[in-house]
C-alpha cells in the first residue's frame, strides 16, 4: 500500500525527532543515557528513547498488539511526563516512518507562530529589540505541534485507541516516578531562573527546595491535561 507523504507544518522551540522502522523473538528497551555502551538487539521490536519509562511504555503497547506507530505515540506521550526539557507537549517535532511495505511517511509537526504574531512583536516603539522578549516570555513560545503530530500519526497509521496508548503517560503523571540524577541536575540548574515564576517553582521543586535523586515527582495537572486529550483528542488541548 502506497501512503501519501504527510506534511503538517508548525514552527519554533522544542524539538523531538521520532524514527520508526517497520517489522521488527526478543524485545529490547533502550535508554540513550544507559550506563552501559553495550549494543542492544531486538528481533521483534525495539524502542529507544531518553527515558526508560517511555521506552518501556512503547514496548508494553507493542506487546499488547499495537504496531510501531502505537508504540511510538505511547513513548512520545510518556516523554512529556518523564523528560520535560525536550519531550513535552508544549513543543513539536518530526516523524519519519518506514512501513512494512517499504513506503516512507514523514510528518512535520514543529511549532507554529501564533496567528496574531507580527514582524515587530519583539521591538519597542523605537524599533529596538526588547531584551528577553523573544527568549524568556510568553511571546517566545510557538503554538505546540507535539499533540497534533502524535494524534495525527495515531489516527492515520495506528491501530489502538487514544485511551490505550496514553494510559502509561497518564498513570506516570498522576502516580509519579523516581527522579534520576540527570533530571535532578536539570531541575537544579534551571530553578534559579524560575524564581520570577512561582507556578514553575512549585512544579519543579518542593516548596522551593530542590528535588533529590530518588524523590517521587508527581504532576497532577499534567495528568488532567493528558486525560482530557485522551477523551477529546485535539479539542482537549487546542
Where are these regions (language model features)?
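N-terminal secretory signal peptides that target proteins for export/translocation
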Residues: 1-14
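Noncatalytic scaffold domains of N-terminal-nucleophile
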Residues: 35-56, 60, 68-238
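Bacterial N-terminal signal peptides
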Residues: 16-31
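Hydrophobic alpha-helical segments, especially transmembrane helices
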Residues: 14-17, 51
